[in-house]
Regions:
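Hydrophobic packing positions in regular secondary-structure scaffolds
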Residues: 1-189
């Protein structure tokens, strides 16, 4: 445990994710809410929600309140609302999404900004002004599109998606059937 506390937050976050539940619980027991929050701050939202899901309701609340990045804390809290064996419980909030009304240069600029917060870019999703999924964007289509083009002109309107309440085994079946690395998760709104 002493050695664990000597590691920086990024390394300890990685270690926490690799430990089995029993060993992770032992470590989390001795860390303060602030120390756990520092580790959680280094994780993607889906991983952070998995770790926090193992804590008591009271401890979870304390840790969430200590996370410095308020938006990150809100995203994690959102994910904790979903049962772990549903699409909502599996999803990550880190993604690249673009608005259908943006021009190509605006899109590229905004994607650069979003990409700094994302570990991997599997897909680029297109949404409308109400954040409703409208399609996906191919990087190739974006690169060859004229600068004056709107994203709605180059987007691919057909996109497979699942509902937040879809069971995880059904999500896996759909992803395997269509050979997908990622699939957008949408709510009823």
């Amino acid at each position: 445990t002493y050695l664990f506390k000597l590691l920086d937050s990024e390394k300890t976050a990685e270690v926490l994710l690799e430990l089995d539940e029993y060993d992770r619980a032992k470590i989390l027991e001795i860390l303060s809410a602030k120390e756990i929050a520092q580790k959680i701050d280094e994780m993607d939202t889906d991983d952070a929600a998995d770790i926090l899901g193992e804590l008591s309701v009271e401890r979870k609340s304390k840790v969430l309140s200590k996370i410095e990045d308020e938006e990150h804390a809100k995203d994690i809290a959102d994910l904790l609302q979903y049962h772990e064996d549903t699409a909502g419980g599996l999803m990550a909030k880190e993604l690249v999404k673009v608005n259908e009304n943006w021009t190509v240069p605006t899109c590229v600029r905004k994607m650069r900004s979003q990409a700094q917060e994302v570990t991997r870019v599997h897909s680029i999703y297109v949404v409308d002004d109400n954040n409703v999924l409208k399609g996906r964007l191919s990087l190739k289509d974006l690169l060859v599109a004229p600068a004056s083009a709107k994203i709605s002109d180059v987007a691919i309107p057909k996109v497979d998606y699942v509902n937040v309440n879809e069971k995880s085994d059904e999500v896996a079946r759909i992803m395997q059937k269509y050979d997908l690395d990622a699939i957008p998760v949408v709510d009823d709104d």
